[in-house]
Amino acid sequence: MAKVMEKEKTKTIDVQAMIDDLAEKANAALKEMESFDQEKVDHIVHEMAMAALDQHMPLAKMAVEETGRGVYEDKAIKNMYASEYIWHNIKHDKTVGVINEDVQKGLIEIAEPVGVVCGVTPTTNPTSTTIFKSMIALKTRNPIVFAFHPSAQKSSAEAARVVRDAAIAAGAPENCIQWIEHPSIEATSMLMNHPGIAIVLATGGAGMVKSAYSTGKPALGVGPGNVPAYIEKTAKIKRAVNDLIVSKTFDNGMICASEQAVIVDKEIYAAVKAEFQAHQVYIVKPDELQKLEDAVMNEGKYAVNPSIVGHSAMEIAKLAGISVPKGTKMLIAELEGVGPDYPLSREKLSPVLAMIKANNTDHAFDLCEGMLNLGGLGHTAVIHSENEELHVKFGLRMKACRILVNTPSAEGGIGDIYNEMIPSLTLGCGSYGKNSVSRNVSAVNLINVKTVAKRRNNMQWFKLPPKIFFEKNSLLYLEKMENVERVMIVCDPGMVQFGYCDTVREVLARRKNDVKIEVFSDVEPNPSTNTVYAGTKLMADFKPDTVIALGGGSAMDAAKGMWMFYEHPDTSFFGAKQKFLDIRKRTYKIDKPEKTQFVCIPTTSGTGSEVTPFAVITDSETHVKYPLADYALTPDVAIVDPQFVMSVPASVTADTGMDVLTHAIESYVSVMASDYTRGLSLQAIKLVFDYLEKSVKTPDMESREKMHNASTMAGMAFANAFLGICHSVAHKIGGEYGIPHGRTNAILLPHIIRYNAKDPQKHAMFPKYDYFRADTDYADIAKFLGLKGETTKELVEALATAVYELGKSVGINMSLKAQGVTQETLDTTVDRMAELAYEDQCTTANPKEPLISELKQIIIDAYNG
């Protein structure tokens, strides 16, 4: 007993040493091949293809003689296919160094070898598979070590020697192609699991493929098939039968993609059967069926009998004890169904075919699915039909990675002969078949692609309404505006009360055509979803061709919401309110309006909504403000006419003016600020500092007009550069504490400036924003305004102080406490307000990424002022 154990130990050491030696030599070859350029690689593989082509007949003969399976002539064709078709397909593939470069996108792809390949080959296609795997391995600069099927060791090794010698003669390293000289399951397992092997390329039975995937390393293992072929009633019968005979008799059915059962519509069943019989195909009689089953299937009837694989129909019939005419090409077994109860509906790898009658298309599809579920999932399914719509339905239904149409399955499945699929002798079955690949395996599967991605700045934009009219009495544009027949005016009650709505009516009355007008005047401050829905209903009833939003930000925002829902009733407020990082890539898109023109006429100088793609709407259920943002909400026309702002009360002018200042400053320091927006931001800031106080205390046409222009200019800037956390916080606490939006911004802004100017705990993420610069941006604003300061820090503080003083000068009490917020209210709401502010859309463009705890502190600081 001890001697036996010692002998086993010695044997294990010998096998291990053999595998270690193969792996070591292969890795040395890998190191040498890594230096090869594309030209040298292509020369080597071309010489391999030529050598294999030269020896395709002797190799085929050797395979048949050694295995006792298959057809000499067909194996010769397979060897030609493995050399000629494979070379033709891969010869122009870039597999070395830089294989692709996109200068515009800044992307470079570099190909590297995956490493040493373990190649496992079957007894069914020994020489052709060896040629194929050797060529795709060396095309990608990967040495390959083979574990051949023991019953085809000699012919497989000869095929490997032929291509190896050609490769070496062309400049490849000596050990670019190797193989296990003394095959065994133990040796194959050791090779697959060896640390010197990078990837396993396995073709064979289910057990071998499973072993390949159990190595803990990448594997390209492809398993067995059980291919159904459906001949539908519109099929060309002669062609379909011919295709099946071509496929099923090729190399005696040993290609795993060959058909295993033909499912035929009942309307043409007899005709198909007769066509088979006309071509020396024997239909097994009912009393012979059991004999055939006993001969073809193994003892348990769950798999093919290995001894009949690749043998001719005549040989199998003789083995089964069935008398058939001389020259019989195929045996067909008529079955009542598929599945375990019908063993001959399994994979048979021989010129034996099951044939089942289908009552209709659904029944046929069920039978095909049953075939695939019986050991063929993921492989191949075939349909013969002239109904192109049915081709697609078949493809959608079948869990097979190759759906072949009007094609012999064996030749069609391997690709390139009958179709445009990648030529291959290793056919992936995807997750259906427990494979990692679902396509035909080729050289592309044996390279690592490294991507060099150069930094890029996102393409930016400058989008505004197509038409912006300004100056006093620019309202007259409505007299000449085209395609105005039915107008709906959206406003708040004040616009009707103070006659502004009538002013618009009067201009529309100057038109040559009779304009029908409907007015929705129920917009409240901080418009709600309920208001938007009510206006949308009126809009749907009236069917306007033009919508005019008349009023402050509330009216314009509400009108945008109505416009959105009127144009596209299926729009989701839930979707529209969601945040985004890039407005062009947002998860929920609002469709562009198509039915109506949208005109905004601002009557306050604050929101800039007349030129922006934003609308702030309050959810009626949660009372939370949400800034909707989509360029579909950009108005078609903005009329910035100062005649509408001459009578705005001082307190409103102060609040809206500070909103303008916040828009301008936040858009200037935004991560998305650009050369196209900063000039607008700066000019708006200067106009506010020059004219707001006068506009509040001693208003005249000039000061009110300048503030009106500043509002629109700031809107133009933040429509494209966006805002920051001042608005994020203001959106939430303004609604919660009942403070006007502009006033809330005024109170927060000095604290935001000081916070943003400090070095960030978390830096902002945006490609164009090269580095943190909010402090210097604020300092630039201070310099532009002529504020005093020797250092950046002093200039930042000067700006924050100037904002604070401006707010005070226009009558704003610059603290939340002074606005009536109690300490108790603050304490019970501040945490939730900070979280909601972080969630706000405006947060994403802030010059530094805020922490929720920091937003909380800003609110606390603003409480005390």
Per-region residue spans from a language model:
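N-terminal Rossmann-like NAD(P)+-binding subdomain of aldehyde/semialdehyde dehydrogenases
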Residues: 2-108, 136, 278
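C-terminal segments
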Residues: 2-11, 16-23, 42, 282-287, ...
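Glycine/threonine-rich beta-strand-loop-alpha-helix active-site module
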Residues: 94, 159, 530-643
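Rossmann-like NAD(P) dinucleotide-binding subdomain of oxidoreductase/dehydrogenase enzymes
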Residues: 98-239
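Carboxylate- and glycine-rich phosphate/diphosphate-binding segment that chelates Mg2+/Mn2+
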Residues: 270, 278, 611-721
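ATP/NTP phosphate-donor binding region
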Residues: 459-546, 816
